[in-house]
Amino acid sequence: MSDNVSDHKPIVLEHRQVGEAVGDFPPDRRLQLPLTAEERTVLRGRRCSDCGLSLLLQLPREGPLQPGDRLLDRSRSWEVVVIAAPEPLLRVQADSVLELLQAAYHLGNRHVALELHDGELLLLKDSVLEAMLRSRGLRVSACERPFLPEGGAYGGSPSHAHRHSHVHSHSHETP
């Protein structure tokens, strides 16, 4: 691995394998790539492995990366496993299923990426959304962990959250 560090050439990753390992890689040719939910939607550009090696993603546009995906260079001499990096989140809990469903409805109406669990919702930390949820009487606490949001009704990217700048032509009014 010292060659990569000393000459600063990134390992160019062009292939994506889903599922089980594609071969036996020696430990010094097997890396991990921690990425946030947003970073997993960007399939091109420079990244850094967990041990500091420079990587260049040049992957086909086949949808967001998922934890466990294996990325390979052209010669298939490096294997890089995608892992979900911990990130600051809000955990939302309610006294009833209905209250939690209403929270999910209002967040979905705002195109907020959500991770759904029995009895709780997780979303990226956002002070405005936190205040809105608290004003509805929900229990909101901060946590840090990997974020695995739902992919959306149309198979789209889970990152179509609060960070976009385009204008929608439909209303976000709540009943």
Curated annotation (Swiss-Prot):
InterPro entries: UreE, UreE_C_dom, UreE_N, UreE_N_sf. The keyword Disulfide bond does not apply. Coiled coil: none annotated. Residues 160-169 have a biased composition (Basic residues). The keyword Chaperone applies. CDD domains: UreE. This is Urease accessory protein UreE. It comes from Synechococcus sp. (strain WH7805).
